[in-house]
Amino acid sequence: QKIKDCDWVIEVIVERLDIKQQLFEKVERHRTAGSLISSNTSGIPIHMMLEGRSEDFQKHFCGTHFFNPPRYLQLLEIIPTPKTDNDVVDFLMDYGSKILGKKTVLCKDTPAFIANRVGVYSIMALFHAVKEMGFSVSEVDKLSGPILGRPKSATFRTCDVVGLDTLVHVANGLKQNCLDDEERELFELPDYISKM
């Protein structure tokens, strides 16, 4: 019920559309009209979360994908839907950069947006190469970190920080929502990932 006093509610729960929709139904019952609502989803298309929501909710709803851990990582993707009010988008872009000190990027509402579409593709390609070439976890992280100009957390440590469950949900979402992608099969999880 304290949600009614909030200017901005950011959803940060498991990467499952059904659970997010259930939460937004509860949030809508208690929020004040005009308050901002956003999702920190890593890859679920933003418009899919709006089913059953009021016009006011839809106008004030946007994706705000903060990269994890947000206290260290600069990127913030702002993902409006066609129903998001332009003033909300302008506010989030401005607040994200000037107040939060983030590098804000305006994204289209496509599966996994920009960074995770590229990043998860890269990780999945590497996962398949690991299976084919028999690399160990430590070998992969040595070869896919600073030596390539990437963070020292490299691949497997990054997946551990973000959460392997999140990666699995995003990869599955890409496979499910990118039916015409010529490399769609790359998002099929190797067996060893399911065992981790």
Task: Please give the residue ranges for each predicted region.
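N-terminal glycine-rich phosphate-binding loop for ADP-containing cofactors
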Residues: Q1-M196
